[in-house]
């Protein structure tokens, strides 16, 4: 007795032209697989024209499963996502030759190539060593350096031109005629000029410039000349009250830039001469004037007590005031100058002090440079 279900499937396979499997008389496979339930969207169309759906069999048929139908279902683009879920839940794993696996391999290879390209780009972007500036940065740096060098050159030319003008003025004996001339010599940026002139520059005035002075202020009434504007203003006050302009008239003006330059002495063999092996410049022109008068000029002032001659009026007046007066210490030493006795007491301390002198601790007027040198010499002899 034959199985009715087997005859049914045999007739159906014969009538279906799309199926090429043999009938049920073929030998079954040694490892049968579970049946594959076709999706709901799959229909069979027999040649007879009537649409029939076979009822689900209660038991698995002995015929082999439809192994070749799986690639056909997986190649369908509309059911790709649905087939993936069905294969994961109900079917066995497909071989790696399916279209989904091929697509996955292609995507994986593309991602790998993209990663390689990214790594390559990162490697190219790395710079080993010192950073090299771009063309724009180099251009900006060159412009900044050129502008700074041009500004330094401009300042240097301005300094040299200003110095040449001042040298020309003093070499030709140009003198200021009043307040306006002196203000013009200073100018609005006189402080800037002075600060620039003091850097590594000096001045060597001639003997006539030293003795006469670089500037002369003349009184408009009696035509008496003065080296300082303040002295001329105080002199003009003696001519009448109409020349008094208040306290601000005594302020005068600031000295010119050349008067603040370090100066060398023009006398040969002098320690302050520029050709001396240990030459040292004097601080400014006023200091040079006093130095030249004391060391190399004539001495028109003479003490009326001892007959000592002096070149500077201030030195002569200070000396004549204290000439012949001795200052005694309780230790028995005597000094010609009060300053020398003070230095002696300060150096030895206890056991030394002024003897028989009233008002010794009172402040006295500062001694001149000549008297200070004499005091130092006396202090060395007493020690």
From Swiss-Prot:
Major place of residence: nucleus
Biased composition (Acidic residues): 361-373
Residue span of region Disordered: 19-118, 147-191, 361-383
Record has Nucleotide-binding as a keyword: no
Cellular component GO terms held in the UniProt record: nucleus
Annotated Pro residues bias: 29-38, 54-65
Organism annotation: Arabidopsis thaliana
Name the record gives this protein: Zinc finger protein WIP2
Gene that this polypeptide is encoded by: WIP2
GO molecular function: DNA-binding transcription factor activity; zinc ion binding
Motif (Nuclear localization signal): 293-296, 336-339
The keyword Transmembrane is assigned to this record: no
GO biological process terms held by the UniProt record: cell fate determination; fruit replum development; pollen tube growth; primary root development; regulation of DNA-templated transcription; regulation of gene expression; transmitting tissue development
Zinc finger (C2H2-type): 217-239, 264-296, 301-323, 327-352
